[in-house]
Amino acid sequence: MSGKPELAGQTVVVIGGSSGIGLETARLARGEGAQVILTARDSDRLHRVGRELSAVIAAFDATDFERLGRFFDELPAPIDHVLVTGPGPYYAPLAKFDVEQARRNVEAHLLLPLQVARDAARKVRPGGTLLFMGGTEGRRTAAGLAFISA
């Protein structure tokens, strides 16, 4: 081993990088020498994280697919790795089920990864990584999980 950090000189984009798994992944990538580019909806939190990690940041809702496309268009090429995390799942008993909230959840968990894959494909170098986080709710049964388990 040369002692060189594993991600030195690489660029890592984290969609949903201001908290949770996205933030911890960004911290690890930065610690391994990567340039980190973060997106998130919460502008204040994203700015704090951006300062902490010396990261490039872009505050917007990634389910705004037009804005997401512009984000990728404006990125320098090549990108080495893209991670997409999503908001938490939508749980509700059927009698209280909000169809509009469910639609937004489908958009964030199913359509967002497809859109990122399409938009990122023109920027990610050959051999690069597209990584999409999922959950385990589809394997569990309980009241209120019918939608997310589908």
Q: Model-predicted segments: where are they?
A:
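Conserved glycine-rich Rossmann-like NAD(P)H-binding loop of the short-chain dehydrogenase/reductase
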Residues: 32-46
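Flexible N-terminal pre-Rossmann segment of NAD(P)-dependent oxidoreductases
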Residues: 1-14
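Rossmann-fold cofactor-recognition segment
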Residues: 52-66
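N-terminal Rossmann NAD(P)H-binding glycine-rich loop of SDR-like oxidoreductase domains
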Residues: 18, 26
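Catalytic loop of short-chain dehydrogenase/reductase
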Residues: 105-106, 115, 129-150
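Amphipathic alpha-helical dimer-interface segment in Rossmann-like NAD(P)H-dependent oxidoreductases
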Residues: 77, 108-128
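Conserved NAD(P)H cofactor-binding loop of Rossmann-fold oxidoreductase domains
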Residues: 83-92
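Catalytic Tyr-X3-Lys loop
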Residues: 95-114
